[in-house]
């Protein structure tokens, strides 16, 4: 359940961009939607794995404070998403851009997943399973978001970011409280 909530939260930047693209590109074909969702999903799956590898390189040095780091990273990312929801800007229609431009958008929306991957190195997490769930959830949500964007547009974009931010803050708080309670 936790990994599904995390996957949902991490996908929100990509979902917001997919909603914006759907709202601005009302002539999206099914293949264009799938291409966009696939690129976002693949990057969303790869970034936590890269973060995990990065985190393993220094986990022994920070094992005593890893819960504070996880709380800080998730709290910061959650707050950032909530603030971004109040400062939404017009995004270009990514659908008419090249695969390279879609990949750049996917990297930009999956930086949070890289940071979360670092926290995986501190926890007892099945990284392969988690990354597959994260990528799959992102793919499914982005596919739906392109179509929802055609109907509801910009109104939903900000709501998705707020929800994702609240979930990240909640997960970070849970990690911190669980660790503190376990060490009382």
Swiss-Prot record:
It is a multi-pass membrane protein. GO terms for cellular component: plasma membrane. GO terms for molecular function: manganese ion transmembrane transporter activity. Belongs to the MntP (TC 9.B.29) family. HAMAP family: MntP_pump. Probably functions as a manganese efflux pump. This is Putative manganese efflux pump MntP. It comes from Campylobacter curvus (strain 525.92).
């Amino acid at each position: 359940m936790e990994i599904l909530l995390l996957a949902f939260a991490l996908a929100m930047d990509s979902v917001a961009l997919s909603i914006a693209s759907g709202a601005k590109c009302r002539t999206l074909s099914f293949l264009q939607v799938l291409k966009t969702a696939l690129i976002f999903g693949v990057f969303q799956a790869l970034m936590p794995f890269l973060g995990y590898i990065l985190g393993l390189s220094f986990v022994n040095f920070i094992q005593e404070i890893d819960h504070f780091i996880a709380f800080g990273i998730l709290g910061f990312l959650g707050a950032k998403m909530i603030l971004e929801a109040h400062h939404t800007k017009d995004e270009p229609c990514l659908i008419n851009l090249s695969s390279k431009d879609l990949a750049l958008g996917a990297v930009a929306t999956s930086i949070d997943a890289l940071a979360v991957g670092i926290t995986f190195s501190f926890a007892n997490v099945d990284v392969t399973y988690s990354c597959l769930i994260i990528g799959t959830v992102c793919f499914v949500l982005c596919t739906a978001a392109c179509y929802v964007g055609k109907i509801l547009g910009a109104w939903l974009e900000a709501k998705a970011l707020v929800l994702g931010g609240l979930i990240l803050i909640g997960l970070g708080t849970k990690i911190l409280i669980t660790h503190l309670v376990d060490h009382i």
